[in-house]
Design a protein with these regions (language model features):
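Active-site entrance/lid segments in N-terminal catalytic domains of soluble metabolic enzymes
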Residues: 1-160, 164
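Active-site metal-binding loops of divalent metal-dependent hydrolases
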Residues: 20, 170-171
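Conserved active-site-proximal phosphate/metal-binding subdomains
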Residues: 152-166, 172-296
Length: 296
């Protein structure tokens, strides 16, 4: 399935794995890339040494293109940015900050730079800075979110820039992929695996950094503190290391389990290959069937 994004990144299907911290390990990234999508190592708040280790592991498992998601608030962002050049990583997606200071070095090294954006203003700025594409991520997505839905955000970003747009947030099957392409996207990004649609809560609105997570003891405590007018420091103390606690330590009660609203649509467990091939096949069938209906 060819699009401008598959040509740009050298992948078979226009499906990109979300940059999920601690979840986006070498094993998952390699599996996604082997299946024809673009696997992504989620650097999150991890040290550069961990990211380097994951890059080496992916290279051992696949010769297909893969990328790294760099959260620019990471204390070791500078070191990781240099590491991507040293290790000849082909693609970097960025979030939680402005990647402009790294652009020149990345572009010289031939790295494809794809920032995550939540507004047309940021999309335009990233295009001007030299981004190869942007990921327009709606508020339905898991983790750090903006306020605009995918349905509203994607066409606005498509109209605002002259580089390819990848849609993210609330896409779990061929219907969502077809909708994204009708809005002008050239690929999709997926992350959330499985949960109930009623189980996500948004915390951190009072801090200006909203995050969508599965509802658990931590979100209940956080929302209670927010409603009581707790300070940023108090709220930060509660969530510090929460994602690692959930993903690495397995404490999904007191940890931060980031997930999107679309989780309720995912009702079974399948391999990366089955998911990617299935969603692309379903998308094609939907577009063809709807074209026939409209033509009647």
């Amino acid at each position: 399935m060819k699009t401008v994004i598959t040509e740009l990144l050298g992948i078979e299907y226009p499906v990109i794995q979300g940059g999920m911290a601690w979840v986006g390990t070498a094993e998952l990234a390699a599996a996604v890339s082997e299946a024809g999508g673009l696997g992504i190592i989620g650097a999150g708040g991890a040290p550069a040494s961990w990211v380097e280790e994951q890059i080496h592991k992916v290279k051992e498992k696949t010769d297909k293109p893969f990328g790294v998601n760099l959260m620019l608030l990471n204390p070791e962002a500078d070191a990781i940015a240099e590491l991507l050049v040293k290790e000849e990583v082909k693609v970097v997606t960025t979030g939680a900050g402005n990647p402009e200071k790294y652009m020149e070095e990345w572009k010289k090294a031939g790295v494809r730079v794809i920032p995550v954006v939540a507004s047309t203003a940021l999309a335009k700025r990233m295009e001007k800075a030299g981004a190869d594409a942007v990921i327009a991520e709606g508020t339905e997505s898991g983790g750090h979110i903006g306020e605009t839905t995918t349905m509203a955000l994607v066409p606005q970003v498509v109209d605002a820039v002259n580089i390819p747009v990848i849609a993210a947030g609330g896409i779990a099957d061929g219907r969502g992929m077809a909708a994204a392409f009708m809005l002008g996207a050239k690929a999709i990004q997926m992350g959330t695996i499985k949960a109930k649609d009623i189980d996500t809560k948004v915390t951190g609105r009072t801090t200006g950094h909203p995050v969508r997570c599965l509802r658990n003891q931590q979100t209940r405590e956080y929302l209670k503190l927010e409603q009581a007018g707790a300070s940023f420091e108090e709220l930060e103390k509660l969530t510090l290391g929460g994602l690692r606690k959930a993903v690495v330590d397995g404490d999904v009660i007191h940890g931060s389990v980031m997930a999107g609203q679309i989780a309720g649509l995912v009702k079974d467990s399948r391999s990366c290959k089955e998911i990617i091939e299935g969603i692309c096949r379903e998308m094609k069938n939907i577009v063809l069937s709807q074209a026939e209906n409209i033509g009647r």
